[in-house]
């Protein structure tokens, strides 16, 4: 077979596999979304089986009330080994659900565990024992007009985006997540670990430098004056899905957000306060 035809065949096979992957993940999302039931049900864990996956879904409130009974209910990856999966199913008295890939027996699955996790995590609740988070708060936010408030939030978001891009240009791993507080943002690195925490601090420093430069160029009331607090601690994570789609926002709540919310009251405009950074 000519090399050109071989290349064309490989491209077609690759496109077909990509289409199969997207269709399968869309079906999985649809099933987990139906289980989710507007947020009353949380997906807890899954494990691979020959023709698909087994997974657990229980009332979200049960996840919180049972979190101390087995660490893997909220800690670690949602893909579980057979023994752990069985133990948690028995502990939560959960029915084991089955999702079939609906593929011929000789056809390998076009999805990876990471693909499945990317969908599964939209409907899961997890806890992180220690992660760096910073809180950007716009000083005197309530004193500005709605137009000025919108401009300031937009400028703050722009600085965070620029900072993340600049840090990434140096080959540093940063996947910045944020959730709004109304007059600012909590921000953290989705990547976990001490290096990731250092990287998110670097993002913060670049963002603050960018904001300082903006103050020299743009009308004062359009550029926010920032109070910032930074620290490390534990938190729960969840994804807030929209009613009609899986699009939504990441949220964190727990020890670290409570501590930062208290600490911000002591921060002055243009000041950074740093909470305890000890590793627990």
Regions found by a protein language model. Give the residues of each.
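Catalytic beta-strand-to-alpha-helix segment of the class III nucleotidyl cyclase homology domain
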Residues: 3-73, 192-280
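Catalytic NTP-binding/metal-coordinating core of nucleotidyl cyclase/transferase enzymes
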Residues: 120-203
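A broad, low-specificity signal for short, low-complexity segments enriched in glycine/proline
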Residues: 90-98, 145-150, 189-191, 233
């Amino acid at each position: 077979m000519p090399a050109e035809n071989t290349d064309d065949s490989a491209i077609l096979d690759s496109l077909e596999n990509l289409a199969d992957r997207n269709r399968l993940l869309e079906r999985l999302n649809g099933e987990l979304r139906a289980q989710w039931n507007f947020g009353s049900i949380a997906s807890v864990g899954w494990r691979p089986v020959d023709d698909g996956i087994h997974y657990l879904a229980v009332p979200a409130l049960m996840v919180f009330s049972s979190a101390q009974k087995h660490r893997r209910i909220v800690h670690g990856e949602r893909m579980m080994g057979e023994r752990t999966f069985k133990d948690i199913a028995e502990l939560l008295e959960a029915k084991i659900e089955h999702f079939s890939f609906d593929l011929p027996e000789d056809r390998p699955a076009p999805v990876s565990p990471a693909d499945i996790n990317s969908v599964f995590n939209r409907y899961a609740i997890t806890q992180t024992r220690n992660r760096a988070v910073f809180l950007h708060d716009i000083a005197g936010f309530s004193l500005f007009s709605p137009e000025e408030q919108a401009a300031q939030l937009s400028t703050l978001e722009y600085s965070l985006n620029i900072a993340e891009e600049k840090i990434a240009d140096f080959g540093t791993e940063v996947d910045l997540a944020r959730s709004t507080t109304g007059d600012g943002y909590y921000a953290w690195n989705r990547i976990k670990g001490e290096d990731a925490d250092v990287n998110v601090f670097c993002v913060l420093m670049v963002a603050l430098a960018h904001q300082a430069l903006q103050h020299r160029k743009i009308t004062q009331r359009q550029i926010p004056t920032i109070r910032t607090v930074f620290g490390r601690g534990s938190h729960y994570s969840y994804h807030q899905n929209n009613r009609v789609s899986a699009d939504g926002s990441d949220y964190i709540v727990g020890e670290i957000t409570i501590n930062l919310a208290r600490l911000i009251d002591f921060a002055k405009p243009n000041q950074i306060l740093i909470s305890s950074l000890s590793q627990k």
